[in-house]
From Swiss-Prot:
Keywords: Ribonucleoprotein, Ribosomal protein, RNA-binding, rRNA-binding. It comes from the Bacteria. Disulfide bonds: none annotated. Residues 1-20 have a biased composition (Basic residues). PANTHER family: 30S RIBOSOMAL PROTEIN S20, SMALL RIBOSOMAL SUBUNIT PROTEIN BS20C. GO terms for molecular function: small ribosomal subunit rRNA binding; structural constituent of ribosome. HAMAP family: Ribosomal_bS20. This is Small ribosomal subunit protein bS20. Belongs to the bacterial ribosomal protein bS20 family. InterPro entries: Ribosomal_bS20 (IPR002583), Ribosomal_bS20_sf (IPR036510). Residues 1-21 are annotated as: Disordered.
Length: 100
């Protein structure tokens, strides 16, 4: 049985070959940023679950910068970024209310 994806043809034109080279670099950069985004969100969620208000607040501030950067570059849609920030903000504020 054949594998799922057909083998890609190599581009003939120089511009096509250049595009392939660029795509490899861009894909690696996007993958790295996507991973950084998810890690930042997970770290805030872990701090919230642990009940650590100070750490959650600190990590949330750092997470916002990462989320905004990724949204500006178009790796994740800006509405998804806003939604994630809003949901985590609510959790961090609830944690602060419980601790107070």
């Amino acid at each position: 049985m054949a594998s799922g994806k057909p083998k890609k043809k190599n581009p003939r034109l120089a511009s096509g070959r250049k595009r392939v080279r660029q795509d490899v670099k861009i894909n690696a950069a996007n993958t790295s940023l996507r991973s950084k985004y998810r890690t930042a969100v997970k770290n805030v969620e872990k701090a919230v679950v642990a009940g650590d208000k100070a750490k959650a607040t600190e990590l949330f501030a750092k997470m916002q910068a990462v989320v905004d950067t990724v949204a500006d570059k178009g790796i994740f849609h800006k509405n998804k970024a806003a939604r994630d920030k809003s949901r985590l903000s609510t959790k961090v504020k609830a944690l602060a209310a419980i601790a107070a």
